[in-house]
Amino acid sequence: MPNEMPSIYPLGVVGSGQIARMIHSAAVKLGITPRLMAEDSGDSAALAAPGASFRHPDALSTFAELCEVVTFEHERIDLGMIEHMEAAGQIIRPGARTLRAALDKIHQRRVLTAKGFTFAPFAELRGPDDLLDFAGLFGFPAVIKSVRSGGQSDRGSWVVDNQNDALRVMAEQADRELMIEQFQPIVKELVVVVARRAGGNARCYPVAETTYADGACLEIRAPAAIGTRVKTEAMETARAIAGELDSVGVIAVEFFLTTGGLVVNEIAARPHNAGHLTLENAPTSQFENHVRAILDLPLGPTHALAKAAVTVNVIGGLDGVDPAEHLHEALAVEGASVHLYGKRPRPGRKLGHVTALGDDMEQARELARRAEAALMNRRL
């Protein structure tokens, strides 16, 4: 029967937010039927595809038995279970080695600094003595971070200007494992998205530049306004990190460009917000190349199609505006591509994004910002 669902799916995606939704769409484009493991029937991807509960302890391993390959859209996973599943012969992409580095920032830094990659000076933060020791060496301001990644929407970091600020954060976040690192004099925040197959074949997308406020990514621009030397260093470093961690699929490496040079900030072992503009600005989006990589299919080209591309995130405000109610106005902005995730609005929640291409960055930025403002019923 034409509508009969397969007994074994070629691809399983754990999570049902917007990244899973876009992975699902990329797979369907290639004629691949993915299976989603949903947290909630009202989640973004769950609205567009069948899913399964993942609230029971055995649900993940049961789900994986229905799929040839399993991938993840978020970091809220049990690493021990992943290792057990791999030992049982199930194919997880990326694998436990990559996921451990993405999930645990201390482990990530120890593994990669041992191989010569540059991070800010850091230390575990188990109590006041660790704080005093670190402050004695590096002073303030400093940055306190949650050791375990909470996913793309988790704030997870706090800039502290003095010892009292640091002790307050430690008390407020007492239920988390914490680390502290030296504050960096940031000139720009950069991201390189890399797609890598199991055999080591990898392709990088152009370096993107991001703008953050209050822990939320507001805007992404590509190509980043940096020199050739920095661009080459960032892409080579990201490719090398993907290889060192034996990553399969898409991995994103975030950098700080500081007054002293390029410093690795974080890695994300999944498609990244900074790569959303590849839906319009690359022959093969990060989502399609993620599907290709984890299924060991040839990677597609990753070069930019336009001289400038800008993505502006659509983030819920205190006024409760629903961007879906203003879609008509946003679509009237010619040259802007609107992506809404089907989420109910709430303050700080990412509800969608808008991407615009242009011959120069300001032209693309103006189009994207106009469409985002229209969605949020706001005048520029």
Residue ranges and their predicted role:
Residues 101-191, 195-241, 372:
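Active-site nucleotide/adenylate-binding loops and adjacent lid/helix of ATP-dependent enzymes
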Residues 261-263:
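Conserved protein kinase catalytic/activation segment
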Residues 194-198, 255-259, 342:
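Short, low-complexity Ser/Thr-rich regulatory SLiMs
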Residues 7, 292-380:
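Peripheral (often C-terminal) accessory segments that flank ATP-dependent C-N-forming ligase machineries
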Residues 38, 205-207, 338-344:
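Short beta-strand/turn micro-motifs at beta-sheet edges
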Residues 232-253, 258-259, 268-319:
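Active-site "cap" helix and flanking loop/linker of ATP-utilizing ligase/carboxylase catalytic domains
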Residues 1-110, 114, 129:
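ATP-binding N-terminal substructure of ATP-dependent carboxylate-amine bond-forming enzymes
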